[in-house]
Amino acid sequence: YFHPAMKNVAPVRKQLGFPTVFNMLGPLLNPADVPYQIIGVPNLKKAEFIAKVVALKDRKRVIVYSSKDGYDEVSTNDITVCFDVKSGEIEKFEINPADFFEPFPVPSANSPEEAELAFMRTVNGSDPLTVKTVALNVALAMKCLGISENLKENFEKANEFLSSGKVYSFIKEIANADNS
């Protein structure tokens, strides 16, 4: 949770086991009032609604997105619809995974252990599918930050960086520093 009031809501949300209005409010109540943000929403109508709310706020750029297959991340298997909010204006665009690679089902984990293994394989570059999944999402973040408007260029840079194992080396370095 970002907003202090959300800490009281979090346990109830978890007990309910289904999305509530607080799932939509969370990203909008960030007290850091970040100028750039990407917000994934698993429902297209809600994504468009959130984009309209964000357009009323004073943010440099926010991209709200939802995949047509119901994920709150850029999908590796279906079109992702994005609402690019800049200076109160909303521009809609789509990301088609087929423009980057042969589409494949979004990787998932069935346990914390599987998630940890997938994370490690991603950061050390040994699992091409999870690397592509993360790289495609990073490409959107890079676009939001203005690094490049070209998603393909951003994807290639992110994919190359993740595949290199540099992220894994950096994480090991931090872990070793914490243990010393």
Predicted features, each with a name:
Residues Y1-S180:
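Glycine-rich anion-binding loops and their surrounding alpha/beta cores
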